[in-house]
């Protein structure tokens, strides 16, 4: 694996981890809270953002205006059944969600969830490293590169991995501060 390819794969893992972080509630209204909520729409699981305009009215309120009013009940049901712990208010045209402040206990749960997402991201990075190192060892065994080249490349791969793991740790720290901020 080339260094550029390794970094591209690791960047994808970082982006996936960030998307996971964005779905965690922080006590402030944020449209990305609903990214993981899907609606059973004509027999197919469809993301809410494909069915409606989602906007934040203020720091505590999210507004969902469906493109098709007939899916209003389905959207409301999906939000109610999600693990977000928020209750939608349906006025017949628009769904409003008041995002209540988080309790201390709920904040700790979300910090654990953020840690879990960070760990999943680190595992993905380590898998990319393992694949790259295995390729280096195979190339060395096949005589395509020298032992010294292989060791240098493996050392470089480890440095890249360490850099990306530190980036995930930084993002986790930022997310935890955001969650714990009252």
From Swiss-Prot:
GO biological-process terms attached to the record: translational termination
The UniProt entry, under InterPro entries, shows: Ribosome_recyc_fac, Ribosome_recyc_fac_dom, RRF_sf
Query: What cellular-component terms does GO give this entry?
Result: cytoplasm
According to the UniProt entry, its GO molecular function terms are: ribosomal large subunit binding
Residue stretches in coiled coil: none
Q: Which UniProt keywords apply?
A: Cytoplasm, Protein biosynthesis
According to its UniProt record, what is one Pfam family this protein matches?
Answer: RRF
Cellular localization per UniProt: Cytoplasm
What does this chain do?
Responsible for the release of ribosomes from messenger RNA at the termination of protein biosynthesis. May increase the efficiency of translation by recycling ribosomes from one round of translation to another.
Regarding protein family, the annotation reads:
Belongs to the RRF family.
Question: What protein name does the entry list?
Answer: Ribosome-recycling factor
Identify the species of origin. Answer: Prochlorococcus marinus (strain MIT 9215)
The gene from which this protein is expressed is frr
